Design a protein with these regions (language model features):
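N-terminal membrane-proximal hinge/A-helix region immediately C-terminal to the signal-anchor transmembrane segment
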Residues: 2-130, 152-157, 187, 204, ...
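Secondary-structure capping and boundary motifs in well-ordered enzyme cores
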Residues: 14, 127, 180-185, 208, ...
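Generic alpha-helical secondary structure signal
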Residues: 40, 126-134, 150-157, 227-231, ...
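Conserved cytochrome P450 K-helix E-x-x-R motif and the immediately C-terminal K′/meander segment
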Residues: 53, 57-63, 256, 342-386
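Cytochrome P450 catalytic-domain "roof"
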Residues: 57-81, 103-122, 134-185, 189-202, ...
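Cytochrome P450 catalytic-core helices
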Residues: 188, 307-332
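Conserved hydrophobic/aromatic pocket- or pore-lining residues that grip, position, or stack substrates
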Residues: 192, 258, 279, 304, ...
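Cytochrome P450 catalytic core segment centered on helix I
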Residues: 200, 213-284, 351
Length: 391
């Protein structure tokens, strides 16, 4: 009798385990508050297609295809909607009068357990504002203008390296072809190394990535695994164990490199201001907990380098693909300056076509290849004319 009862309980438990996901899928497809929003049914039913695309690194391209099929508003997960509309930025990211603020989605942005906050992971607006206030003086127009000689130094070195490449002989002809994308990365990382840590990564000098920069790119893959695991809280620990040890090591090594760089910079006085100068008090102590400095400068290293290089690469690609635009830009620049030394930040601001090209580059090649998810505030709200429930 006891054996029969045990078998019955096991069978009932198994039936419940099977019934739950089926019922959940039916609910998501037909009864969920987002059920009427267009989108692929497989993505609306479960998070699995979303997470697969995230781990494979195709999610941004998949979203673009979905918007081409379903329009500017697409349901890309049971509880997630994406927008490809000009009003979306103002509705989601700006604080609108009479509306509650859309906060960062903690599934994406919250720090990992046991890790310190960064300017990126700070969910509460007041915490983000505190960190931003400390760093802001380093990003004023006056502060950035003071760094112009340093920026010019690395831009000149980039131009020299490009001249060197153009002088190489390939297939018996002078003028070798080369991928300019990595060279933009070399430049922006070297500049941020000086501005953030008081010393260059010497990528341009050595014509290759610093080993730590290579680690940084590899760590993005680990971040995708971790983000996907967070969508399944009941089995997150088990999923985290499925992340390859090699990727976990990459993330650990990447963070340790940041720790070493920050500690090295804090150990000496620099003869010029940099971003870290605004974090250090006059008595040598810091305005932020050391953990927050590590985490924030890890974010800034990527945000201040790779993003700029991505936009420059995309903009250059558009220019070489459209000879008329390239010729017009070339004419504007060469008619405005007699020599390279005349190309100051102030002078470049006066070139309208250059400004238009850079703005169009930012529009067509956005430097952040991510969705930047936000949570609908309590009570729900409207985005681009579409009502969304809270959460």
């Amino acid at each position: 009798m006891a054996v029969f009862e045990t078998q019955s309980l096991v069978a009932a438990a198994a039936a419940l385990l099977l019934a739950y996901p089926v019922c959940k899928i039916v609910y998501n497809l037909y009864f969920h508050p987002l059920a009427k929003i267009p989108g692929p049914r497989a993505w609306a039913a479960t998070r699995l297609p979303y997470c697969r695309a995230l781990i494979q690194g195709t999610i941004v391209h998949d979203f673009e295809k979905l918007h081409q099929i379903y329009g500017p508003v697409v349901r890309t997960a049971p509880d997630e909607v994406t927008f490809a509309h000009g009003d979306a930025y103002n509705d989601i990211f700006r604080v609108r009068q009479g509306h509650k603020q859309f906060l960062k989605d903690p599934v994406w942005w919250a720090r990992q357990k046991g890790q310190p906050d960064s300017i990126l992971s700070a969910i509460r607006p007041e915490n983000h504002a505190r960190i931003r206030k400390i760093l802001a003086p380093g990003f004023t127009t006056r502060a950035l203008k003071a760094q112009e000689p340093l920026v010019q130094k690395y831009v000149n070195l980039l131009i020299q390296r490009m001249h060197d490449k153009a002088s190489e002989v390939e297939d018996g002809k002078k003028g070798a072809e080369f991928d300019i994308g990595p060279w933009f990365n070399f430049t922006t990382f070297d500049i941020f190394g000086e501005l953030g840590f008081g010393e260059s990564f010497d990528c341009l000098e050595n014509s290759r990535y610093h080993p730590w920069i290579a680690l940084l790119f590899s760590s993005v893959k680990a971040a995708a695994f971790i983000s996907a695991a967070k969508f399944f809280p009941l089995i997150t620990l088990m999923l985290m164990k499925c992340i390859p040890e090699s990727l976990k090591k990459v993330q650990r090594d990447h963070f340790q490199q940041i720790v070493d760089k920050v500690d090295r910079r804090l150990s000496w006085e620099l003869d010029r201001p940099d971003f870290m100068s605004h974090v250090i008090k006059s008595d040598g102590t810091t305005k932020m907990p050391i953990g927050e400095i590590y985490a924030t400068f890890m974010v800034m290293t990527t945000a201040g380098s790779e993003t700029t290089a991505t936009t420059l690469s995309g903009t250059m690609n558009h220019l070489v693909s459209q000879p008329d635009a390239l010729a017009k830009l070339t004419k504007e620049v060469r008619s405005a300056f007699q020599s390279e030394s005349d190309m100051t930040l102030d002078a470049l601001h006066d070139l309208p076509y250059l400004d238009a090209v850079l703005r169009e580059g930012l529009r067509t090649c956005p430097p952040v290849p991510w969705m930047l998810p936000r949570v609908v505030p309590r009570g729900g709200d409207t985005v681009c004319g579409t009502w969304l429930p809270e959460g």
